[in-house]
Amino acid sequence: MELIQNAFEQGLIPGIVIVIYLIINKIIDNNKRNPLDDIAKLLNIVTRDIIEKDREKSKSVVFIAINNAASECTKFVASTIITNNVDSNRDQIEYNARHLVNSVYYDTYSKLNMYRGDEDYLSHYMKEEWKEDIYGDIINIVYNKNLDSNQRILAFNKRIDIRVNDYTAYIINKAFK
């Protein structure tokens, strides 16, 4: 009996010390923030920032790509009006205009296909009918007999600027809701 009492006394004090240590350790751990939570918060902030920058970059790409296409069309119209006898070269001008419009449309399409909106690639918001609209503008303005050369060039510049703004706004609004 004395042996059991002696063992109990010797084991009780270390047991109490261990229990107190575990309680204090648990209290300290609860007061500490979990480092994984801090890492998760940091990743959320960084990811959100990257996504927002990517959205802004994509919006800029839409504007630049469509503006470049419009610039090519404007150069074509200006050089055609200035250097060609438009009446005698009508077939060639129409052929060149058709191919230019197709070329700049698909070039813009391929550039926009490298970037995504919220749900889909930016190029998927382009419309095939835009090619016909631009082609029609080129032909109608180049062959407008009521305007002189400078007026036709200015008229096309104004028309293409309106289209650039419309197409850019359309793609951005559809891609980034």
Language model feature labels by segment:
Residues 3-32:
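N-terminal signal-anchor transmembrane alpha helix of single-pass membrane proteins
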Residues 25, 74, 104, 134-137:
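Alpha-helical transmembrane segments and immediately adjacent membrane-interfacial amphipathic helices
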Residues 28-60, 64:
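Short juxtamembrane segments adjacent to a transmembrane helix
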Residues 51-62, 82-91, 115-121, 143-154:
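Charged, low-complexity interaction regions
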Residues 73, 96-105, 109:
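Repeat-associated, polar segments at repeat-unit boundaries in modular proteins
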Residues 95, 99, 114-136, 140, ...:
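Acidic, low-complexity, intrinsically disordered interaction modules
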Residues 133-135, 139-176:
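Amphipathic alpha-helical binding modules
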